[in-house]
Amino acid sequence: MTTGVGNRVTTITAAALEAIRAHGVQTFPDECCGALIDVGGVIVDAFALPNTTTSGAARRFQIGPRDYRASEARATELRGALAGFYHSHPNHPARPSQHDLDQAWPNFSYVIISVNAAVPGDITCWHLKDDRSAFEQGELICPTES
């Protein structure tokens, strides 16, 4: 796992982190995507969602309105909150693209996993700057993983 240098810290359980890794491998060479559910200040669930893009799933992801609502329902079911989203970058670094920036919403965490040749790699966490001009890398910590 790669941690960032920003001042925002996102804590995630080992189970949620493993779910992101597994989803990235399962969908390779396409991008995976899903929702991050926070309960008590910790991401406890990485809720897999279908990638509904029509612009080439190997380079893009899209979460449709129905799946967004399903994410909110999952958060309510867990008595938590929708904290953000995750997706994979097949055969590319775990850094946000311009497309990621263009599609991002404020106040969410964005976790990106690099999956190279179907092997999970670095995982990073990003937050949209208040002026929406860029992402700032945050720190992703998993208390039970070193």
Go through each PLM region and give its residues.
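Conserved beta-strand-loop surface patch within small alpha/beta domains used
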Residues: 1-82, 90-146
